[in-house]
């Protein structure tokens, strides 16, 4: 046991060369001890039978570093060899690609064709129709679906339609079919024409009714003025009230006594009826 303790003590002293320079009580010092800057003593050479094994181990061992140096990070050749041969060992046909296929960038992706619209009803909307009118329009719109043309009626067609509307404001289905065949029109055209014509007729009737009401209101005020004037004239033409004794002059007619004379007649007796007639002189 004593031999082993001496052996371990000797090895500790060999590994720590500063042990010979340290005192019994450690003292605080801001500077590191000088023994750290001293080179390490080389170990004794190993036996020849272990020289080959130690040589291979020293190739992968980290280099000798000082306490104030940071060792550079180097890639292990075995790990690098494993990284290079990993896809081949796993049997991958293609290496892992990025988020964009075939090396394309976000700006290089082709936009979907705008000329081919997925639904037919999208071509008849106004948003695509007006764009199709221009030469550089990106929307392929058929000419007949671009804009609905307005139906132009001839004079003969309008004459027949007006005659029919004069007799019937609302046309029946059999008569509409007959007119469509006779005028070379569709039933839809005739139906829409009658709807528009009825709206126009109703507006004209409302305008006539409003103008007649306005003229009737203006003419209704005039008779009231005339009646007021005539009533004043009648009051002026009435005879004076009878005397308090109740005696009425003999020339006043009975209608004037009762106050029922017309406005053109006066209550006073005419002088021709009161004055005596003169006898005619012989010639």
Swiss-Prot record:
Residues 13-73 are annotated as: Transactivation domain. SUPFAM superfamilies: Homeodomain-like (SSF46689). One of its GO terms (cellular component) is cytosol. Residues 238-252 have a biased composition (Pro residues). A motif (Antp-type hexapeptide) lies at residues 118-123. Keywords: Activator, Cytoplasm, DNA-binding, Homeobox, Nucleus, Phosphoprotein, Transcription, Transcription regulation. Residues 36-66, 201-283 are annotated as: Disordered. This is Pancreas/duodenum homeobox protein 1. GO terms for biological process: positive regulation of insulin secretion; positive regulation of transcription by RNA polymerase II; type B pancreatic cell differentiation. It is found in: Nucleus; Cytoplasm, Cytosol. It comes from the Eukaryota. PANTHER family: PANCREAS_DUODENUM HOMEOBOX PROTEIN 1, PROTEIN ZERKNUELLT 1-RELATED. Pancreas; islet beta-cells. Interacts with the basic helix-loop-helix domains of TCF3(E47) and NEUROD1 and with HMG-I(Y). Interacts with SPOP and the methyltransferase SETD7. Part of a PDX1:PBX1b:MEIS2b complex. Belongs to the Antp homeobox family. IPF1/XlHbox-8 subfamily. The keyword Translocase does not apply. The modification Phosphothreonine is found at residue 151. A motif (Nuclear localization signal) lies at residues 197-203. The keyword DNA-binding applies. PROSITE patterns: HOMEOBOX_1, HOMEOBOX_2. Phosphorylated by the SAPK2 pathway at high intracellular glucose concentration. Phosphorylated by HIPK2 on Ser-268 upon glucose accumulation. This phosphorylation mediates subnuclear localization shifting. Phosphorylation by PASK may lead to translocation into the cytosol. GO terms for molecular function: DNA-binding transcription factor activity, RNA polymerase II-specific; RNA polymerase II cis-regulatory region sequence-specific DNA binding. The modification Phosphoserine is found at residue 268. The Antp-type hexapeptide mediates heterodimerization with PBX on a regulatory element of the somatostatin promoter. The homeodomain, which contains the nuclear localization signal, not only mediates DNA-binding, but also acts as a protein-protein interaction domain for TCF3(E47), NEUROD1 and HMG-I(Y).
